[in-house]
């Protein structure tokens, strides 16, 4: 179930302030954030945001196609190593 339309999209204030200051100064620094829940706004386009995945900060370059999605969608938290190999061949 998605967020109510009357509430509008959510962005953490500290993240929005950092992006606004970068836009005013035309600076392209990497912004570190732990806010995976923040929605990507059009103001974020062209910036690189390092999103925390529980272990390290994953750099995510924001493009126009990402607007409206959450930051956490682009920094996976789980690493899939694949299923174990079939041991039937080695038992013979």
From Swiss-Prot:
Cystine bridges: none
SUPFAM superfamilies, per database record: Ribosomal protein S19
Keywords, comma-separated and alphabetical: Ribonucleoprotein, Ribosomal protein, RNA-binding, rRNA-binding
Entry-linked PROSITE patterns: RIBOSOMAL_S19 (PS00323)
GO biological process, one term: ribosomal small subunit assembly
A Gene Ontology cellular-component term: small ribosomal subunit
Gene Ontology molecular-function annotations: rRNA binding; structural constituent of ribosome
Gene3D superfamilies: 30s Ribosomal Protein S19, Chain A
Function, as annotated: Protein S19 forms a complex with S13 that binds strongly to the 16S ribosomal RNA.
Family listed: Belongs to the universal ribosomal protein uS19 family.
The protein's name in its UniProt record: Small ribosomal subunit protein uS19
UniProt gene name: rpsS
